[in-house]
Structures are given as structure tokens and as C-alpha cells.
Swiss-Prot record:
GO terms for cellular component: cilium; vacuolar membrane
Gene Ontology biological-process annotations: cilium assembly
Name of the molecule in the record: Transmembrane protein 138
Family: Belongs to the TMEM138 family.
Organism listed in the record: Mus musculus (Mouse)
Lineage: Eukaryota, Metazoa, Chordata, Craniata, Vertebrata
Positions bearing carbohydrate: N6
Length: 162
């Protein structure tokens, strides 16, 4: 079971990684004149998103619901976050690769193709949704019902068996 102190530490780590993601999304364009620094920030951002995915799944594995074999229940409750986080990671990596390819040789020019602008808008839109759904999931996983046997869990188990 996830202890209160451990949960606070994990939640703080998740929010720190989300804050870094927000920081890079907000200020990375200011560093377009320094492509190496921008590349490092992008790599760390993608790793932070990946760490957030790993942390969420570790929190899933730690629940009583998962240990009782109700993986479908967890997936059903949190599938939006799982899918959105995966899409956001793919959009972020795609945007970072495209931006670095366009700007690496000539960082002083302002070159935005229509496709790059479209990808940029979708990545930023996904970033907002990712932050909201990820924070909601992280807080919802603190619910004690997920970590102990309860009447709610028994009802869910009976519905799954039908």
C-alpha cells in the first residue's frame, strides 16, 4: 500500500516533472538561437514525460485493485489519461525532431512551415489536456478505495464477473 509520506513524495515528483514540461513548452522558443541548449531541454522534457508514464503505471501496480486482478477496471477508469499521455509523448517527440531539423543549421532564421505550425498547435493543445488529466489521475490514485478491500471494489468485481 502507498503510505501517505510516499504518496506525497511521488505526487511532488510528478508535479515537478509537469512543471518542467510547462517551463520548456513556455520558454523553449526563446532559446532558438542556441540549438544545443534547446536540444538538451527537449530531450529532458521527453524523458520527463516518459518518467511520468512510468510513475503512473507504478502507482497502478501498487493498488489493491490491480493486485486483485481488476486491471480492466483501472484501464477503464484511467484510459483517457493513458491514451492522451501516449499521444502527447508522440506529438512532443515529433515536434522536437522537426524543430531541430529545421533550425539546426540556421538558427537565426525564422522558418515555420505550415506543417510545423499545425504540429506546434496540436502539441500545445495536447500539453494542456495532458497536464489536466495527468494531475487529475495522480490525485485520484490517492483515493484509499484503490488500496484496500471495500464494498465499492466488491461491487465492481461482481460487475466484471457478469
Amino acid at each position: 500500500m502507498l503510505q501517505t509520506g510516499n504518496y506525497s513524495l511521488v505526487l511532488s515528483l510528478q508535479f515537478l516533472l509537469l512543471s518542467y514540461d510547462l517551463f520548456v513548452n513556455s520558454f523553449s522558443e526563446l532559446l532558438r538561437m542556441a540549438p544545443v541548449i534547446q536540444l538538451v531541454l527537449f530531450i529532458i522534457q521527453d524523458i520527463a514525460i516518459l518518467f511520468n508514464i512510468i510513475i503512473i503505471f507504478l502507482m497502478f501496480f501498487n493498488t489493491f485493485v490491480f493486485q486483485a486482478g481488476l486491471v480492466n477496471l483501472l484501464f477503464h477508469k484511467f484510459k483517457g489519461t493513458i491514451i492522451l499521455t501516449s499521444v502527447y509523448l508522440a506529438l512532443s517527440i515529433s515536434l522536437h525532431v522537426w524543430v531541430m531539423n529545421v533550425r539546426w543549421k540556421n538558427s537565426s532564421s525564422f522558418s515555420w512551415t505550415n506543417g510545423l505550425q499545425t504540429l506546434f498547435v496540436f502539441q500545445r493543445l495536447a500539453a494542456v489536456l495532458y497536464c489536466y488529466f495527468y494531475k487529475r489521475t495522480a490525485v485520484r490514485l490517492g483515493d484509499p478505495r484503490f488500496y484496500q478491500d471495500s464494498l465499492w471494489l466488491r461491487k465492481e468485481f461482481m460487475q466484471v464477473r457478469r
